[in-house]
């Protein structure tokens, strides 16, 4: 199997705020960075201070001082379903448009190896691009050669990309954003020139090959892929593109309100709105994309959307948009000493918010930001990679962002149950490592990786833990949890001593078959107690609880390795082993990192597959800070610390695992390494990295090439082609998800039901603050100043017992209800304080004898950001290149 080396692998709305005066100033944010007066919000009868979110976010706006001349460098906007990269090539402001459900589905008669089969290359289900919108005239208004000034800004608080350009030839002022109701993209455009010129607003669609395996194999003869079924159209007020794909169709419609124009169809792929020559064009473009799965008449539906937007008018839509985003940002915050990482946190959260409200979760590679026609690396849903962007969203108090992912995975259940029978001849459900949007799974090459289903089930369980949404648990989470647990019940074998074993599986993506793989054991130890608790909550399956408990209590223990030496001959302490090899084999450098080491059947393994030995820590949470002082905790720490820097990869999780174990400095070291290697795109996107340290999978220059094998007549040949690597430059979501998750875990942990504040801060981080959500639907606001934790504010969204590890170990805790001022009884056991909460109430938690004051609010470090930021050689934004 080849992959990734294998793997080249809260809460009233704030008052509506006026628009920024230009792309490079924020009129509502003081330039000196002085904080605006703190406001108050009310939630469930709770009044509490609130920071100036606008000022906090303005610090982190992404600023371009030069035009983005490549789509991949564009600023991301969207309505949560339809998105665009806004970029500024010399010919004019351009929007590369995508949508969450533009699926070109594969035929039903797919083979078991459809994911990697050469015969199936360019036939597999693909999320294709939407269209390109360009506003152009006959002058090079945005050519750097003629620019006097240029500023573009991603205004995070307002969720707008703003452009302001000046040259001797004229000026461009534009603002683009996504409007969730009625579901349109909006471009506000004002262009002036020194002489009368005609302008064209062009809408085009040119499909292409997908190049899922760009690094390994491709079909040079498939150049007609994506070109068929496209038709451009126009009426006096609209232009559009329609395309019929293999199973669905879609339409993209644009309407312009402003300067007079006429429409024309240039060819089957392009339609335009053309103005008469004038020295100024002013107006708004409204654009909608609709598929036949949303409406049987997508063209008419898309037309209705843009007409509704035009009828409401720009100012009304923008006011509504601003209110929605003010409310969005009021849900959470964090502030840490590393401003650059904090900036990436907010940018990553924004990017997910503008793309993860659609029918499907955005694919991890490219997301809804593919810049080059339909080309997309790793075009399927890969379970581990697809989870990572969603790891942080519940703690960030945005569980709504996980809805598309949760829905997709729960709707896959029937297919996973079928594949459990077909592939493994077992009951329950087996989720494969790789699937398409219909849940059709890879049934060869990855069949011995048994953990995806249970890890997916635990994603759903985590969503319940943070939201306490009983209906979600009943309808979506528990059925998947139960079915995946049943698969393991059928798969496990019991030995003569009554101990249950996993007889044969692989650890994550390893090709090595093992017994008692640590990934399976970790998944079972997490999921079986979760199934028991879920069945108790729902009042079902009492008889199954007995079975789950019996297996859990008699499951084989994790195995360890060492002390000794690893495959590379390096001395190591006692660490976790991935399992016991079931075969004799000799390692290779490509797969195992070292050449020629002989492994014998029955030998314990270590360091063989994607740091799988850390699975007991994360994502399973079987070992964490609650286990401090135990042998297994110490082994976990040594295992994490033994991870080589080369393994600090964008798609792995040692940073999160380090934070879970309280290793704040190590977590920071890893996330710094990952950011340096993988955050190469100027708008703050991460890309894949490569096996070579400090070498992201991103074209170093225009002549960098990939050399895949050529496929002819459905067969892979020994011939190799040279494809420009820049064709495949695109963002990858895992790095941002991992960064967010790591920072969340450094500031707040609650995965085991106990709230721990600042559990993994680096030694140098004396000051930090946050408002994040904890398991049990508690919203926690905390500030640490000069190394001292201030009183905490805990809001109970659903009621229940709050369990909190005392952040002042030498002092006793007092809890006071904020609204009434009454004291609340507190019970303490082994350093864990417990008190009962009421839904909608907020509580101050503070040491007895200290003032009962709310935690200090974060203050902006400076005013609105005016320039690109640099850090350790990385940059957010774009410097001036003229």
Regions found by a protein language model. Give the residues of each.
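N-terminal export signals
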Residues: 5-27
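Acidic/polar, glycine-enriched structural segments that form the non-catalytic walls/loops
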Residues: 29-72, 77-379, 399, 409-418, ...
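Catalytic cores of secreted or luminal carbohydrate-active enzymes
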Residues: 136, 730-780
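Carbohydrate-binding surface patches
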Residues: 180-189, 776-803
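Surface-exposed beta-strand/loop patches in extracellular or lumenal glycoproteins
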Residues: 197-205, 795-809
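Active-site core of glycosidic bond-cleaving carbohydrate-active enzymes
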Residues: 382-415, 438-439, 445, 449-470, ...
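Acidic/histidine-rich catalytic neighborhood
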Residues: 483, 487-537
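Solvent-exposed beta-hairpin/edge-strand motifs
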Residues: 805-821
